[in-house]
Amino acid sequence: MKFKTSPIIYLISKKKLFIEFMRFSIFLLIFSLIFGFSNAKEFHIDFSDEGMKLLKKRGFGKKTLYTNDQDDKGWYLKAEADGTATGLGMEIDKELLKEMPFLNITFKIEKDFDNIDQKTKDGHDWAARIMVGHGKKIGAKLVSLAHSSFLEEGFLQESPWTKGSRDYVISNDKSGEWHNRKINVKELLEKTHGISFTNFIAVFSDSNNSKQKIIAYYRDIYFSSE
């Protein structure tokens, strides 16, 4: 004797199967949002009280004032330069760029320079910049990833002060708001100096040449694999 499946029972079973499928799909979505399926790697510069202990002052003469603070988005660094030229930096592993060639930078400019010519020695100051490269006393090969209100993004030059240093403008933002940039620093260092590594990173806000006062902020600075 053959038994036929009731249409009602068939519909109920199909509905249960659909509900279970949707539950599983939602679980996968939540899992991917929380944990992600990416193998992306990141190395962050820490501006917390503990992280600040790892940053060393770089430069000579009258010192730029650097202070850290936090808001609802986390820790940030404030830089105030008034005829000063020093930075904060740390040594990093030379192998880092092999896995994490990208540098992510978020900053904002509260008070910028009046009209200066950053292509000359007298105007060669930057409200906000990140320095990378082969840092050493003799024969250094450096790149400054800089903000400029006077030069276009993508502008690249040899520093008027130092043959082994390059200035690369990554931001021309004049909004006064937080903004972020991502740069493949491994490719940039290969292009400018023929090296594919950096042994340090430093934030550097200076105004010693123009003798003007500037205020800038940095946050969320990190190397990443993608």
Language-model segments: residues:
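N-terminal secretory signal peptides that target proteins for export/translocation
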Residues: 1-22
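Bacterial N-terminal signal peptides
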Residues: 25-34
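Extracellular carbohydrate-recognition regions
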Residues: 40-59
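Extracellular beta-strand elements of beta-rich domains used
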Residues: 47, 219-223
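Short carbohydrate-recognition loop motifs
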Residues: 67-87
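Extracellular/lumenal carbohydrate-interaction signature centered on repeated Trp-anchored short motifs
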Residues: 92-103, 122-123, 172-175, 195
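Extracellular ligand-binding interfaces
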Residues: 110-174, 214-217
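Extracellular beta-strand ligand-recognition surfaces/modules
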Residues: 125-130, 163-215
